[in-house]
């Protein structure tokens, strides 16, 4: 696999403390605020007119929860991310035509949110391991493009 046993330990150790539902909504919300062009995929979600509107939007929270639960399932198949995300890749890439760059952006936002939630515990080693994971997931989601 692309993660060492030690890195897997760091990732799983932190992930076991993550409130997936809460962090998912926050990460997707921040994506839409920080990178406003990503909003075009969510036009059916209602009010995205301001940062406050986005962060409190129930549909954004619900989809963020879904996104992070999928990510969580992916962590259980860390050595076969392509397999774990094949169906989601097909949906997002072939049907919704999401630019794969957006998966990378969301991964980076997730890293920021985890740093924000965990402070000192999210040390450079943990960050490095998570950065590998989000890059791996992004590339698994994008693989239909290659």
Curated annotation (Swiss-Prot):
GO terms for biological process: hydrogen peroxide catabolic process. Residues 2-146 form the Globin domain. InterPro entries: Globin, Globin-like_sf, Globin/Proto, Hemoglobin_b, Hemoglobin_oxygen_transport. GO terms for cellular component: blood microparticle; haptoglobin-hemoglobin complex; hemoglobin complex. Heme b binds at residues 63, 92. Keywords: Heme, Iron, Metal-binding, Methylation, Oxygen transport, Phosphoprotein, Transport. It comes from the Eukaryota. The modification N6-succinyllysine is found at residues 17, 59. One of its GO terms (molecular function) is organic acid binding. It holds the Pfam family Globin. The modification Phosphoserine is found at residues 44, 50. The modification Asymmetric dimethylarginine is found at residue 104. Heterotetramer of two alpha chains and two beta chains. Belongs to the globin family. Involved in oxygen transport from the lung to the various peripheral tissues. This is Hemoglobin subunit beta-2. It comes from Panthera leo.
């Amino acid at each position: 696999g692309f993660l060492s046993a030690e890195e897997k330990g760091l990732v799983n150790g932190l992930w076991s403390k993550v409130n997936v539902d809460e962090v998912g909504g926050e990460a997707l919300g921040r994506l839409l605020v920080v990178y406003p062009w990503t909003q075009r995929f969510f036009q059916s979600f209602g009010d995205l007119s301001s940062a406050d509107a986005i962060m409190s939007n129930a549909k954004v929270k619900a989809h963020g929860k879904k996104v992070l639960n999928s990510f969580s399932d992916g962590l259980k198949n860390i050595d076969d991310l392509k397999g774990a995300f094949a169906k989601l890749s097909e949906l997002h890439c072939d049907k919704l035509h999401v630019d794969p760059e957006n998966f990378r952006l969301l991964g980076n936002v997730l890293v920021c949110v985890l740093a924000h939630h965990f402070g000192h515990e999210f040390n450079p080693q943990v960050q490095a391991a998570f950065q590998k994971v989000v890059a791996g997931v992004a590339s698994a989601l994008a693989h239909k493009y290659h």
